[in-house]
Amino acid sequence: MIISFYYGWKKIQPFNLEVRSKNLTVSVIVAVRNEEDNINRLIQNLKSQDYNPSLFDIIIINDHSIDNSLEILKNERLKCSNLKISSLEKNCIGKKQAILKGVKLSSSDIILTTDADCKFSNSWISNMVNKFSNTDINLISGPVAYHLEDSTFANMQSLEFLSLVGSGAACIGLNKPVFCNAANMAYRRDVFLEVNDYINNNVFSGDDVFLLHHIKNKYKGSILFLKSFESIVYTKPLSNIKDFINQRIRWAAKSNSYKDFDTIVVALLIFLSNASLVLLLLLSPFNF
């Protein structure tokens, strides 16, 4: 498995921004819930992008925030002409519904998603959108990494998360995409609307992976991973082991809904690898 991942990673060509995308319109969609500490920085990060401001807008969907997120957004809108704000209705909740609402509000060619607590370079939009000049490309998965912190637990998370991102990228390199991360993901709006009805709406989260699977099945060979330092989106590691375990439980819960063969095989191999490591640790005392 490791050899296959290495081969898949090497197959991905490093990205070089040689030709600017011609007049592709972009909507950056962010779902927010109680993000008052992050919104100002997020908007400033997006306003500083080197992509033509007339070709992109920012759509923030408020997912029932109970802090000052909505008030901060309204103040930011006075200073940012391409910022759009909307809130989920009472009977709708969660990131999946927020993204769907944002896509329906958009009229752009390309949808680019990230999270409120993320940071990225000023050329992030330009890089993520560039490959869509090729009309055969429908989805681009971008790199995501944790901020390095002075904490053993945080750095362990960073290493583990890096292996997940690398594995996902390698599978794309092998033309067998299995997962991606909505914190750094771009796709054609019309393709999203085309396949959205087939995405499992009984699963609360995981819309990024299910979207990737449906695009993979309908448009084979149309998914890329962007191997570029300038395209990395940085996010925060979890603060404690409890949150880490809960996150992994959420991820595992949606795996029962996966129907993609490649994803099931990779998940099984990873499970067996981890199980063998645990077994080795348990048996090691008997060797002394």
Please provide the spans of the model-predicted regions.
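Short aromatic/hydrophobic "clamp" motif used to bind/position activated sugar donors
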Residues: 111
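N-terminal membrane-anchoring/stem segments of glycan-assembly enzymes
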Residues: 1-22, 158, 167, 280
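Alpha-helical bilayer-embedded segments of polytopic membrane proteins, i.e.
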Residues: 1-5, 255-288
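Cell-envelope/extracellular polymer assembly enzymes that use nucleotide-activated donors
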Residues: 24-27, 57
